[in-house]
Amino acid sequence: GSSGLIAMPRV
């Protein structure tokens, strides 16, 4: 959940 570029879970 750092940028919106890569699909990262905000957990």
From Swiss-Prot:
Highest rank taxon of the organism: Eukaryota
Any single Gene Ontology cellular-component annotation: extracellular region
Residues carrying Valine amide: 11
Keyword Secreted: yes
GO biological process terms held by the UniProt record: neuropeptide signaling pathway
Keywords: Amidation, Neuropeptide, Secreted
One Pfam match: Periviscerokin
Compartments reported by the entry: Secreted
InterPro entries: Periviscerokinin (IPR013231)
Family classification: Belongs to the periviscerokinin family.
Protein's name according to its UniProt entry: Periviscerokinin-3
